[in-house]
Each structure stands twice: as structure tokens, then as C-alpha cells.
């Protein structure tokens, strides 16, 4: 027996034993989990319905938008309903097929009824981005290229399903956006209108975070929970901060804890660490470290070795 066959055989036997010992490796009750690929496809294609002039190459979308929207929504309704039904059946073993189908249809109907409202809220988010970023040349640029808007778009869809307690799918959606943008918004967070994330990489918004209107976050901001060993005991407890209206939080600031409230019209400076409430109309900043600036002894050439010693 050659080395490859021997190694594969041993690995197969060991893996199979692990499958038998731990049920987590296999779906329960001979039922499927929702398809991550199918859920992501729905997210991608709904974007073409929300912003048809940007993410759909068919010229008919511009000439006959009503027919385009109806055609796409019919197809997407069925595909999302199928995944919701699968998720419900997996999470609730006692649920019968007929009951799951009826509940999935109810949830899906409510989701699609709210799409026009989501579209209007996203336009407000676009406006917030345009007002908040002098580098933005147009609103079209924001819609077509800004990662912050994409993460917010996915969150606003996922949040609708989260409120209906749909298992698995909301998190699949937002983790897709997380992987694409580096922005981690839990679908359970509550976020008001005119929300803008500038740059975005490293932003974290926890499940029980509440964010008001006209809030702007920069890269690396964490709206998180204080570390605890209680784990699942805190699953339904508010663990993340509340951010009131008209707040700006600069890069790499951390605002932590369920009892922490940042009041209206407040500015949180970069690299701050906040675990207690901040009153309205306040500026918070960390004391700057002392900079040491030395004049070099002579002009530096490209071949010089830098010496940071005295």
C-alpha cells in the first residue's frame, strides 16, 4: 500500500469515528440546513431590485422597471421562502412540512411587503454618506462602490428576518457582508435612518446595540459587550450600548456594555475606551501621547539607514 492510500484510509476511519461520536458534524433529524449559497444569491439579486440601474445589466430594467421588478420578485419570493422553510424545519424538529410551509409563506410575504420601506431607508443612508464624506463625488458613487452602504443594505434585509425569529438565515446574510467588507453588523441590532459607516473596515456592531438617527461611524469602531463567562445566560439581555441621535464616533473607539448610553449630539474621539454613559452634547477624547520630533543631523539620502537612537 502506498503512502497516500494509507494516510487517506487512516484519516477516513478516524473522521468517521468522530462523526459517530459528535452529532454536530451532521444535520439533525435527517433534515437540511439552509443553503448558504442560495441565501447569498437572494441578497445579491435583491440588490438589483432595490437599485436596478446599478446591479442589473439587462437594459429592460431601465425601460420597463415595473415588469423587471415583478419578474425578479416572483422568483426571489419562491427562493427565499424555500430557504426559510428549510430553516424552520431544521430548527423545530416537531414542525410538520405543511406548518413550516405556511409559516415560511407568512414570513416571506411580510418581508417583501417591507422592501419599499427598506429601499426608502437606504436612500436616506446614501444621503448620509454623501453629506458625511467630502470625498464622495456623487450619490451614484456611494451606491455602486461604498462598502459601508453594502453592509447596511444587507443588515436592513437581515434585520427583517431576525425580527421574525427566522433561524440561521439572518446571520448567513450579515456574515456574507462581513466577509466582503470587514464590517460586522449583527442582524439583531436596531439602527435608525441616515446611518453612515465611513471606510468601514473593522467596525463591529453587537446584537443588542441601539443606534439612533444621523449616526456616523469610522473604521475600527466597536459597539460591543463587556467580556463575561456567563455566555448563553445573557442571550436575551441587553449587552451592547445605546447610541442616540446625531452622534459621531471616530476610528478605533470602543463603546461597551448594555447600560452604556451615548447622548445626542456627542462626538467620541478616536482610540477611546468607553464603558460608562456619556451625556448629550459632549466631546470625548483620549489624551494624546507625547510626540518626540527630532531634526536630523543632516539631509537623509535614500541609502541612509534610519537610526531611532539618541
Residue ranges: model-predicted function:
Residues 177-296:
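Structural signal for interior beta-strand "rungs" in well-ordered beta-sheet cores
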Residues 1-175, 298-310:
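Terminal amphipathic alpha-helical/low-complexity segments used for targeting or macromolecular assembly
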Amino acid at each position: 500500500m502506498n503512502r497516500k492510500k494509507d494516510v487517506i484510509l487512516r484519516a477516513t476511519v478516524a473522521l468517521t469515528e468522530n462523526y459517530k461520536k459528535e452529532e454536530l458534524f451532521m444535520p439533525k433529524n435527517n433534515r437540511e440546513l439552509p443553503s448558504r449559497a442560495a441565501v447569498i444569491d437572494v441578497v445579491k439579486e435583491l440588490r438589483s431590485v432595490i437599485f436596478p440601474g446599478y446591479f442589473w445589466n439587462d437594459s429592460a430594467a431601465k425601460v420597463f422597471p415595473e415588469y423587471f421588478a415583478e419578474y425578479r420578485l416572483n422568483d426571489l419570493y419562491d427562493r427565499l421562502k424555500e430557504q426559510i422553510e428549510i430553516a424552520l424545519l431544521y430548527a423545530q424538529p416537531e414542525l410538520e412540512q405543511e406548518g413550516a410551509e405556511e409559516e415560511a409563506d407568512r414570513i416571506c410575504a411580510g418581508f417583501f411587503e417591507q422592501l419599499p420601506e427598506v429601499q426608502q431607508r437606504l436612500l436616506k443612508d446614501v444621503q448620509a454618506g454623501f453629506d458625511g464624506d467630502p470625498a464622495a463625488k456623487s450619490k451614484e458613487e456611494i451606491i455602486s462602490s461604498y462598502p459601508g452602504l453594502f453592509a447596511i443594505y444587507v443588515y436592513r434585509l437581515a434585520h427583517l428576518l431576525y425580527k421574525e425569529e427566522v433561524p440561521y438565515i439572518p446571520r448567513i446574510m450579515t456574515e456574507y457582508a462581513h466577509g466582503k467588507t470587514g464590517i460586522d453588523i449583527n442582524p439583531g441590532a436596531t439602527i435608525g435612518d441616515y446611518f453612515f459607516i465611513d471606510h468601514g473596515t473593522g467596525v463591529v456592531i453587537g446584537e443588542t446595540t441601539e443606534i439612533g438617527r444621523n449616526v456616523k461611524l469610522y473604521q475600527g469602531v466597536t459597539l460591543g459587550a463587556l467580556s463575561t463567562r456567563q455566555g448563553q445566560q445573557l442571550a436575551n439581555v441587553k449587552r451592547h450600548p445605546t447610541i442616540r441621535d446625531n452622534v459621531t464616533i471616530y476610528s478605533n473607539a470602543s463603546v461597551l456594555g448594555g447600560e452604556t448610553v451615548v447622548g445626542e449630539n456627542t462626538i467620541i474621539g478616536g482610540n477611546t475606551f468607553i464603558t460608562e454613559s456619556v451625556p448629550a452634547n459632549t466631546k470625548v477624547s483620549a489624551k494624546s501621547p507625547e510626540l518626540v520630533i527630532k531634526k536630523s543631523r543632516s539631509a537623509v539620502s535614500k541609502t541612509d539607514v534610519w537610526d531611532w537612537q539618541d
